[in-house]
Amino acid sequence: MMALALASTALIAAAGCGGNSEPAKSGAASGAKVTGQVTSSGSSALLPLVKDAAAKFKSKNPEVSLTLNAGGSGTGLKQVAEGSVNIGNSDVPAEKKLPAEKAKGLVDHKVCTMTVAAIINQDIADKVKSLTSQQLQDVFTAKVTNWKEVGGPDEPIVLVTRPTTSGTRALFTELALAGQEEASNKSLETDDSGTLIQSVAQTKGAIGYVALPYLVNNKDVAALAIDGVAPTLENTYNGTYKVWGYEHMYTKGEPTGAVKAFLDYILSDEYGVEIEKQGYGVSSKMKK
């Protein structure tokens, strides 16, 4: 069995690394030289976007060092509140993971929306394309334990679960499971979305859930519709698919220097065109 990584790390080395940099007016767009260091941790669901943005930002600002970790939303929020990282990435508002006094000191930067999809092993996908909301809840709470009970083959259901620190789990629990806690499967528990997909792909009868960006160009697993509605950006925008949330990048107080420049870049029109390409949603397109 593969090692289940609870954090995924990407280090983008600096050509030259300074200390604190002067605040940038709109990231690299101001034309001022940006130097310094940016550290982030948290949501594995947001990590692909953060890594992509960091690579593009780095190409424009070679003297900035960026160290990017996953580890789960709870971890990211805890670390940014403690000051051990500059940015804490989260799938849920800070108030849902931190005590009120700690959450109060954080500044929320909403960067995009994230759709979450239930995924299944391909050996189940031929017969099971969609589950009702009730069936999905019964599967993840272990009230249903065999796929034949929901129209699939005679195959035990294997849950691939996430730890309680996971923001993706918190969102899925609230919106897909109507607040019911999923049954635990410690032997296949991970908050690394890439590892979770591998586990579902390699385990007969497996089911789990991931953010939509992890399914872009991925044929190893199949996404389930809920009540006949597929987990797509279009269905998220028009309000028919309900399992989605805003992605947050928190700072302890207002950001300055390289951290501000990096966040300004992610929120810029220049980078905005890249968001949908990766499977994330543009907040302004959400149906009011």
Describe the predicted segments one by one.
Residues 18-74, 78-82, 86, 90-100, ...:
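Exported/periplasmic ABC-transporter solute-binding proteins
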Residues 1-4:
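Bacterial N-terminal signal peptides that target proteins for export
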Residues 12-16:
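C-terminal motif of bacterial Sec signal peptides marking the signal peptidase cleavage site
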